[in-house]
Amino acid sequence: MKTALPLLLLTCLVAAVQSTGSQGCPTYVSEKCTARLQECSNNQQQEPLQNCTAVHADCVVQATEDCQREQSQLNHDHLNNHTTTQQP
């Protein structure tokens, strides 16, 4: 029974991803990179502001790619689960 809980969480995650589609990415990217930008500006003594802008831009690109890759992987797994579990 120990495997039931993570599986249930994964199912919820997949459902959430599918319901938001790629629209979920901007929120994910914004949250992740806003935190990164805040962290950078807090360390203003070490890094000039234009570095923070570059860091933020890189973060947006990377996080968007990560999010889209995760979504396509989750959707792929979800489809596989349906095709394999519906056998008699």
From Swiss-Prot:
Subcellular location: Secreted
Record's keyword annotation contains Mitochondrion: no
Keywords: Disulfide bond, Pheromone, Secreted, Signal
Disulphides: 25-33, 40-52, 59-67
MF term (GO), any: pheromone activity
Propeptide: 69-88
Keyword Secreted in annotation: yes
GO cellular component terms given for this protein: extracellular region
Signal peptide (from-to): 1-19
Function summary: A component of the complex of water-borne protein pheromones that stimulates attraction and mating behavior.
Quaternary structure, from the entry: Binds to attractin and temptin.
Protein's name according to its UniProt entry: Enticin
Organism annotation: Aplysia californica
Lineage, top ranks: Eukaryota, Metazoa, Spiralia, Lophotrochozoa, Mollusca
